[in-house]
Every structure is written in structure tokens, then in C-alpha cells.
Amino acid sequence: MSASPAPTPEGADQAGPLYLTWDDIGLATTELAQQTLAAGVPQAVVGIVRGGLIPAVWIAHRLGVHDVRTIEVTRTTSDAVNAAKTPLPTVRNPASIGNLTGLDVLLVDDIAGSGTTLAHTAQMVRDLGPARVRTAVLAVNRANWPAGSEPHDRIDHIARLTTTWVVFPWEEQHDQL
């Protein structure tokens, strides 16, 4: 994976969920855009539905990219904190992503726990024939990360590392503060 500046460690030792604010998201998407820009502007930004949509659009705006696409991949069985996961990610309507042949693509999600959803989706995108696929996430939850590997071994751009559940400002639980 590409070398990126060290992600910010906020929330690394926090007890309970980490509630990110819209300001946090603005800073994180700016950081991810800067990391991405260091290796060149992508031709398309693909957001993983649902959580990756908002950061994908913000990053695309910061990079001046107009080609923003989506791919619906699910693994978490509900929106509850520490919700159960299915063994493998499920892709719904894979044709919705369109033709990526020869494009430089940035694939964006909000969170990587084990990294399985992002890795599975990145491989599916690579199978569509783009020239390059880079990955970016707002946060990595190291509490769920596989032992013996580092997030930067599998993810190109990371804004934040934590060891707790992350609640984003667009999620229902966020308003229950």
C-alpha cells in the first residue's frame, strides 16, 4: 500500500463508543483527500453504501472529482452498536457501479473493523478492470483488526485509528447523546 502520514490516534484508549462530529468528518475527509492527492487525483470516487457515501462525496469535492459512484455492500446485520456481522460481505446490484475500465479509482468507506468488507469490495472493483484502485477510510477499529497485520498493509489512506465502536454524525445513535 502507499505510504500515508500516520493517522490520528484520537479515541484509541476511549471507553465506550467514539462519537465523531461533523467537524471531525470535515477534518478527516480533508486529510484523506490530501493523502490521496499525494499519489494523484483519481478519475472516479466510489462510495460503499451506506456509510461510505458521505465521505466519498466530501473527498470527491475536495479533489475536484465529478465522477462519484456507489456500490452496495453489506456485512453488518443492523445499525446497533457492536452489531453482528455476516461471514462474508454481500454485494447488491453489482452492475450499479458501471464501467471502470482503465480508470484510476478511489474506493471509500466510513469504517474498517476487520477490513473484510473493504478488501472484498476492492477486489470486486479490481475485477472490473480499472488501471488502479486505492482505498480510503475515515477510521479503523483496531479492536477488530486481525492479529499479525497492520491496517496500512491493506488500506491505502486512513484518517483515524481507534479501538472502540465509532458512531458517525449521520447515524441515528449519534442523536442519542
Question: Which residues fall in each region the model found?
Answer:
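Short, glycine/charge-rich flexible loops or terminal/linker lids adjacent to PRPP-binding catalytic cores
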Residues: 29, 65-105, 116-120
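PRPP-dependent phosphoribosyltransferase catalytic core
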Residues: 2-12, 123-177
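Glycine-rich phosphate-binding loop signature in dinucleotide/nucleotide-binding domains
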Residues: 36-41, 98-101, 128-129
